[in-house]
A protein has these predicted regions:
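ATP-binding N-lobe of GHMP and related small-molecule kinases
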Residues: 1-82, 100-102
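ATP-dependent small-molecule kinase catalytic core of the GHMP/sugar-kinase superfamily
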Residues: 1-15, 101-128
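Short, flexible active-site-adjacent loop segments at beta-strand->alpha-helix junctions, enriched
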Residues: 78, 88, 127
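DPxDG-like acidic metal-binding loop motif
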Residues: 82-108
């Protein structure tokens, strides 16, 4: 069943795995646009025009959480659309890095509704 927020009403079990993309972030000083690039074995499958990184940056600017622009390079080691949460974990990593402080639960929930329901998983401080 699809809910009002566009997500499906499901229950999921999560298992954290030792698999990760590599993300390089640099502040851009003379441009008013982000430069996002993808490399690696799974880079060709990433939607360049609309992806979790573009979404998280756009939302952060709408909420006045960031004011700079960034060059972001992602080495895609996590298969795209595989269910491993690669895009969502990248968004969470960028959010944590750029904010560089504890993020309120309410803020995480707001981002979860726009990025993906598994986003909150990447803010859990303890393993299972």
């Amino acid at each position: 069943k699809k809910m009002a927020n566009g997500f499906h009403d499901i229950q999921s079990l999560f298992c954290l795995v030792d698999l990760s993309d590599k993300i390089y972030i640099k502040k851009i000083y003379n441009k008013k646009t982000d430069e996002i690039s993808f490399r690696g074995p799974f880079s060709k499958m990433v939607k360049k025009n609309e992806n979790s990184i573009k979404k998280i940056l756009r939302i952060m600017r709408q909420k006045n959480m960031i004011f700079n622009y960034y060059s972001i390079k992602v080495i895609k080691n996590i298969p795209v659309f595989s269910g491993f949460g690669g895009g969502t974990s990248n968004a969470a990593t960028i959010l944590k890095h750029l904010i560089n402080k504890k993020i309120k639960k309410k803020t995480i929930e707001e981002f979860t509704n726009k990025i993906g329901s598994d986003l909150r998983l990447f803010f859990i401080s303890k393993g299972f």
